[in-house]
Amino acid sequence: MVQFMKMTEAAYAAYLPEAIKEYAEEKVKAGTWAEVEALDRSATEYGQLLPDGIQTKQHYLFSIVDDPEQPPVGMIWFQLSESTHGRTAFIFDFKIEEGHQGKGYGRQAMEVLEQVARRMNIKKIKLHVFAHNTRAIHLYETTGFVTTDLHMTKTLN
């Protein structure tokens, strides 16, 4: 079973530029942002969400490890918020590295996340997934997530 290890500053320094780039690419692929603006917008969003990096309050960034002596197989980042409905975790990023996909690490990570959430008295876990990411959608649906909102777009020529 995989484990979550608090992300180190070095891991965060390696993660951030790649995450900014990947998020920009996903927003362009989804048709939400124009390519010319995507990288700047992505960097701005990350700067607003994580102004203090891994030290940002209520944000939890973990490396996902199978063997603590080996490089991580992935990462997960969620934010904790509180409301009248109880504590909620919102997953901002979750990734299993390409060479480790299809080995059950994603499913294991979702199980570990549930354990962590229960220990933190979290009542709900939420996330956003791009509609074109069918592999992720399948993982989330088969681990108990349900669609709560759905945005649709029609491009006019």
Name what the model sees in each region:
Residues 93-96, 102-115, 119, 138-142:
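Conserved acetyl-CoA-binding loop-helix of GNAT-fold acetyltransferases
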Residues 3-98, 116, 147-156:
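Acetyl-CoA-dependent GNAT
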Residues 123, 127-136, 153-157:
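Conserved beta-strand-loop-alpha-helix junction that forms the acyl-donor binding cleft
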Residues 1-4, 129:
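Generic anion/oxyanion-binding catalytic loop in active/binding sites
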